Regions:
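A residue-level marker of the well-folded mature domains of exported/periplasmic proteins
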Residues: 2-225
Length: 225
């Protein structure tokens, strides 16, 4: 897939009137498209696999603007770039993109906007999607709890991007902890809040703190670092 570079203010053609071979997909990533693990990587893999399953040419039909922070000005610029490339649908994968994507959906009514993790829609060309990630975190908690029983260390660490201000991170913490407690009720989960979706330096520091100061034998994380 190529990186989108051009800008434009023209709306792409109506998605319903575009042939499969001419359909263009845009994606706005919060981290690097070259990541080999993590949240952005998972999204990129899902988008490319879906396109391949539909017989689309990823190299020619997917346009990406990556490393876009949760800043309305930069999100808006990324959308303009992708619309300028002729994209018929644009995926924005970070929660903080929701307001600017709503604005841009009104500006470009013939483009479909799909926002991951958000809650806004306009019932026409702006929708949202998300999986029940807390269920997977419950399973991760089960695995962590079983490992703690195996090692005899009941201290478990968890580095979360945010605390309880977002339903996603709050449910992730709770889901993981409930999984731990289901198999090891004597375990304690120590949570460190990163205050950002991605911060490699502090995530590393928190992991070391959980190991050295809290004697955690198992560590889980909910970040894109």
């Amino acid at each position: 897939a190529g990186s989108a570079a051009s800008t434009g203010s023209q709306s792409a053609g109506s998605a319903s009137n575009v042939s499969a071979s001419d359909f263009k997909v845009g994606a706005i990533y919060i981290n690097k498209k070259s990541d080999t693990a993590g949240y952005t990587y998972a999204h990129h893999t899902g988008i490319t696999k879906a396109m391949e399953a539909l017989g689309m040419d990823v190299d020619k039909q997917l346009f990406i603007v990556d490393e876009v922070p949760e800043d309305d000005t930069q999100v808006g610029a990324a959308v303009d770039t992708l619309v300028g490339e002729g994209c018929n649908i644009i995926f924005g994968i970070s929660f903080g993109y929701l307001n600017e994507m709503e604005v841009k959906a009104e500006e470009y009514p013939d483009v479909i906007f799909s926002h991951a993790t958000g809650f806004k829609s306009n019932e026409t060309n702006y929708n949202n999607y998300f999986g029940r990630i807390y269920q997977a975190r419950y399973l991760a908690g089960l695995a962590a709890g079983l490992k703690s029983l195996e090692t005899g260390n009941n201290n478990i660490g968890y580095v979360s991007a945010y605390d309880t201000e977002y339903a996603e991170t709050c449910s992730g913490i709770n889901g993981f902890t409930l999984g731990v407690q289901a198999v090891n009720p004597d375990a304690t989960v120590y949570v460190k809040e990163l205050g950002a979706w991605t911060d490699e330096v502090n995530e590393y520091a928190f992991a070391e703190e959980l190991i050295n100061s809290y004697n955690c034998g198992v560590i889980a994380q909910h970040c894109d670092s």
